[in-house]
């Protein structure tokens, strides 16, 4: 049965829009856990556009399930992760001009720097995942440099313009899962997943955790966060 990791970045985005203290992502994380989330995911960006250092520190003290920190593989972020010690870190690409993470890491190009970051984080007892496209070459290099997990970037599937394109993207994801499992890599998935499409990916099998944020927070505005998390959790677990 797959797990649901709830990304609460958008709660912080709303707070930062007015520069105040509400809504508090710490409170949102607690509600998500009460509703059945198996973990909480946050992205501490270098520009601190949404999640703040304060959020990370308090969440480390309050999260009762698992805390997954998305981060760039920089010296600053590695040092922060080692000080706070989330259960897991997901290394992601980061561009200051992007609205959200636009694609997977190019592990082949950055493998030396990523290997150093992975080794430091693992030495601190942290599970390390790499956010990558469902590309066999990227998966093989992720395994080569010692990652514990990959998180498959599902954005191309979510943005497919036709049924045929969607099917082709699903095949890529399925093949990526099979290869990662063959290499003894754990597999997570995320980006662009919603109430209308997540079951198609979950039905593939072999994916341990789905990290979902925007779709849950969008529904939460209409039905409340508790209900939104429960609905998504049911889709993920019983696909």
UniProtKB/Swiss-Prot annotation:
**Annotated catalytic residues:** 43 (proton acceptor), 70 (proton acceptor), 191 (proton donor)
Cytoplasm as a keyword of this entry, yes or no, is: yes
What Gene Ontology biological process does one annotation of this record name? pyridoxine biosynthetic process
- Give the EC number(s) listed in the UniProt record: 2.6.99.2
Tell me the InterPro entries matching this sequence: Aldolase_TIM (IPR013785), PyrdxlP_synth_PdxJ (IPR004569), Pyridoxine-5'_phos_synth (IPR036130)
Q: Which UniProt keywords apply?
A: Cytoplasm, Pyridoxine biosynthesis, Transferase
Q: Indicate which residues the UniProt annotation says bind 3-amino-2-oxopropyl phosphate.
A: 7, 18, 192, 213-214
Q: Which GO terms describe its cellular component?
A: cytosol
Q: Name one GO molecular function term.
A: pyridoxine 5'-phosphate synthase activity
Signal peptide residues on this chain, from the entry's feature table: none
Record bears the keyword Methyltransferase: no
Which reaction is catalysed here? Answer: 3-amino-2-oxopropyl phosphate + 1-deoxy-D-xylulose 5-phosphate = pyridoxine 5'-phosphate + phosphate + 2 H2O + H(+)
Q: Output the superkingdom of the source species.
A: Bacteria
UniProt site (Transition state stabilizer): 151
Per the entry, what this protein does is: Catalyzes the complicated ring closure reaction between the two acyclic compounds 1-deoxy-D-xylulose-5-phosphate (DXP) and 3-amino-2-oxopropyl phosphate (1-amino-acetone-3-phosphate or AAP) to form pyridoxine 5'-phosphate (PNP) and inorganic phosphate.
Q: Which PANTHER family match?
A: PYRIDOXINE 5'-PHOSPHATE SYNTHASE
Complex and partners: Homooctamer; tetramer of dimers.
Question: What name does this protein carry?
Answer: Pyridoxine 5'-phosphate synthase
């Amino acid at each position: 049965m797959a797990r649901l990791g709830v990304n609460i970045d958008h709660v912080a985005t709303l707070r930062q829009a007015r520069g105040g203290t509400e809504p508090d992502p710490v409170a949102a994380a607690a509600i998500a856990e009460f509703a059945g989330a198996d973990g909480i995911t946050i992205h501490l960006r270098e520009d601190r556009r949404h999640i703040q250092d304060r959020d990370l520190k308090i969440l480390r003290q309050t999260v009762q399930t698992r805390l997954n920190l998305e981060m760039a593989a920089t010296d600053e972020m590695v040092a922060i992760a080692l000080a706070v010690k989330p259960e897991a870190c997901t290394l992601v690409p980061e561009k200051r001009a992007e609205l959200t993470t636009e694609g997977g890491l190019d592990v082949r190009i950055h493998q030396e720097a990523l290997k150093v970051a992975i080794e430091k984080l693992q030495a601190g007892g942290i599970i390390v995942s790499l956010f990558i496209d469902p590309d066999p070459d990227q998966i093989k290099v992720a395994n080569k440099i010692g990652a514990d997990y990959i998180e498959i970037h599902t954005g191309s599937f979510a943005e497919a313009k036709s049924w045929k394109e969607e099917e082709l993207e699903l095949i890529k994801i399925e093949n990526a899962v099979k290869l990662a499992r063959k290499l003894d890599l754990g597999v997570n998935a995320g980006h662009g997943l919603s109430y209308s499409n997540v079951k198609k990916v979950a039905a593939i099998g072999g994916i341990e955790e789905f990290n979902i944020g925007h779709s849950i927070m969008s529904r939460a505005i209409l039905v409340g966060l508790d209900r939104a998390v429960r609905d998504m959790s049911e889709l993920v677990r019983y696909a």
